[in-house]
Amino acid sequence: MNKFNFQNLKKPFIIAEMSGNHNHSLERALQIVDAAAESGVDALKLQTYTADTLTIDKSDGEFFISDPNNLWKGESLYSLYQKAYTPWEWHKAIFDRCKEKGIVCFSTPFDFTAVDFLEELDCPIYKIASFENIDIPLIKRVAQTGKPMIVSTGMASLSELDDLVRTAKENGCQDLTLLKCTSSYPATPEGTNLLTIPHMKELFKCNVGLSDHTLGIGAAVASVALGATVIEKHFTLSRADGGVDAAFSMEPAEMAQLVRECNTACEALGEVSYEIQEQEKKSIVFRRSLYIVEDMKAGDRITEKNMRSIRPGLGLKPKYYNAVLGKKVVHDIKKGTKLTWDIIENFI
């Protein structure tokens, strides 16, 4: 797993983000692993933190979520993170289940202690969350592991992105993927701005993907057409079960559809080609071509009445229609005869 390389991807790398959708049940967490693997994803991602590594136990002022439009309104930051965190003692069991099911398991560390803990589990990839993409010391510490890094870019300015990319590369990261991300839960299609993906790829000379908080699969599939190589979506067994992130998470059948359609989009990109494809050759016969549509005698002239451009495509191409109008035929012709040069006077 330590040799995983995002430079060698042949298809989109699809990540199911468990986040807090385990609802504080290890059994449910393992069921999420099983369902994710069954849906065809490449990886399952955890988040490694505690409420105390993210904030302080304070429930007023700026530590309280009062925005009526916020998904987590009425919570303090501390109480929210207590509900959402994945107990560290579960990590090994989840990593082991992922290995058993044939998918990659990795995590997002939120402080140095989480990095140290994940290194003991031989975590093969590290993710930096959007809210931490300005935490340069953390980015530096993760880069120093030498593992591939994925960084969500939500809320980051261009200069902040430059800071994080430089920090990662200067501290040993040779395999960096930036994820276009809109840090809104859920995100709207009009606020997703997928056209940033090819620009970001060109600007920072690295792989680019999408951390997708929109509902449905449309944005993810479209991102593949724009060059996204990594797709991350939150994942749960059922939104009806509730949970801190359930409202914008994919269910198993939806994730399976996302995997299929992203792979189809990738295959369909192909290459720039104006050649007849091998699979098209049998269809050539059904193109239009010039045919005689009335019985004709030798010496009769070709007219708009006795010649038409019709299917099938075995006669002269329609572009010769005007060139042969008024020309004589050299022998009797039956209705339904394809027009060829050898039956036209002066074209033999």
Tell where the protein language model's regions lie, with residue ranges.
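Catalytic cores and adjacent flexible loops of soluble metabolic enzymes
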Residues: 1-348
